[in-house]
Amino acid sequence: MEHAVGKVTFKITLTSDPKLPFKVLSVPESTPFTAVLKFAAEEFKVPAATSAIITNDGVGINPTQSAGNIFLKHGSELRLIPRDRVGYCE
């Protein structure tokens, strides 16, 4: 009997676009979240190197975890933002 691989689904919204488009991505729980970030950025045609993912509450997410851990800690609704808006203060 094959072991079923658990998947998690994220709804990622692009906050830099006024229309707030979103993508729904389903990935295996063990997927590195850096790969999810990169794929989401490519789907929205924004540079992954200058993008970050935050929660709907504005909490930054460290992408060096598995997708399963991110899902358990932060849920399924996330936001993709340009990194120049992270922690910026005048």
Curated annotation (Swiss-Prot):
Keywords: Isopeptide bond, Ubl conjugation pathway. There is a cross-link at G87 (Glycyl lysine isopeptide (Gly-Lys) (interchain with K-? in acceptor proteins)). InterPro entries: Ubiquitin-like_domsf, UFM1. SUPFAM superfamilies: Ubiquitin-like (SSF54236). GO terms for cellular component: cytoplasm; nucleus. GO terms for biological process: protein K69-linked ufmylation. It holds the Pfam family Ufm1. Residues 88-90 form a propeptide. Coiled coil: none annotated. Belongs to the UFM1 family. Ubiquitin-like modifier protein which binds to a number of as yet unidentified target proteins. This is Ubiquitin-fold modifier 1. It comes from Brugia malayi. The lineage of its organism: Eukaryota, Metazoa, Ecdysozoa, Nematoda, Chromadorea.
